[in-house]
Swiss-Prot record:
<comment type="similarity">
    <text>Belongs to the GroES chaperonin family.</text>
</comment>
<dbReference type="InterPro" id="IPR018369">
    <property type="entry name" value="Chaprnonin_Cpn10_CS"/>
</dbReference>
<dbReference type="GO" id="GO:0005737">
    <property type="term" value="C:cytoplasm"/>
</dbReference>
<comment type="subunit">
    <text>Heptamer of 7 subunits arranged in a ring. Interacts with the chaperonin GroEL.</text>
</comment>
<dbReference type="GO" id="GO:0044183">
    <property type="term" value="F:protein folding chaperone"/>
</dbReference>
<dbReference type="Pfam" id="PF00166">
    <property type="entry name" value="Cpn10"/>
</dbReference>
<dbReference type="GO" id="GO:0046872">
    <property type="term" value="F:metal ion binding"/>
</dbReference>
<keyword id="KW-0963">Cytoplasm</keyword>
<dbReference type="InterPro" id="IPR020818">
    <property type="entry name" value="Chaperonin_GroES"/>
</dbReference>
<dbReference type="InterPro" id="IPR011032">
    <property type="entry name" value="GroES-like_sf"/>
</dbReference>
<comment type="function">
    <text>Together with the chaperonin GroEL, plays an essential role in assisting protein folding. The GroEL-GroES system forms a nano-cage that allows encapsulation of the non-native substrate proteins and provides a physical environment optimized to promote and accelerate protein folding. GroES binds to the apical surface of the GroEL ring, thereby capping the opening of the GroEL channel.</text>
</comment>
<dbReference type="GO" id="GO:0005524">
    <property type="term" value="F:ATP binding"/>
</dbReference>
<dbReference type="GO" id="GO:0051082">
    <property type="term" value="F:unfolded protein binding"/>
</dbReference>
<protein>
    <recommendedName>
        <fullName>Co-chaperonin GroES</fullName>
    </recommendedName>
</protein>
<dbReference type="GO" id="GO:0051085">
    <property type="term" value="P:chaperone cofactor-dependent protein refolding"/>
</dbReference>
<dbReference type="GO" id="GO:0051087">
    <property type="term" value="F:protein-folding chaperone binding"/>
</dbReference>
<keyword id="KW-0143">Chaperone</keyword>
Length: 95
């Protein structure tokens, strides 16, 4: 199965969060912050959203930064994804 987003929605796969701090302290599961960096795995078609034409600016494979509390978490075939509106993506990480 695969997720196919509608409208201006984007499916993200969260990148793994750091398990140790810069000073070498190992963080237990509850102490780790929710990562805000993810890879785009699917992009909706855009189109009319709330009466405005939306052009999708991200593409599959882009690494992005998204708003901390944005989106809906989804588990599919033992994999976890987050579905966000394109508007909740604040930046594309350029190499």
């Amino acid at each position: 199965m695969k997720l196919v987003p509608l409208g201006d929605k984007v499916v993200l796969k969260q990148l793994v969060a750091e398990e140790t701090t810069k000073s070498g302290i190992v963080l237990p599961g509850q102490a780790k912050e929710k990562p805000q960096q993810a890879e785009v795995v699917a992009v909706g078609p855009g189109g009319m959203v709330d009466g405005k034409e939306v052009t999708m600016q991200v593409k599959v494979g882009d690494k992005v930064i998204y708003s901390k509390y944005a989106g809906t978490e989804v588990k599919l075939d033992e994999e976890e994804f987050i579905v966000v509106k394109q508007n909740d993506i604040v930046a594309i990480v350029a190499d």
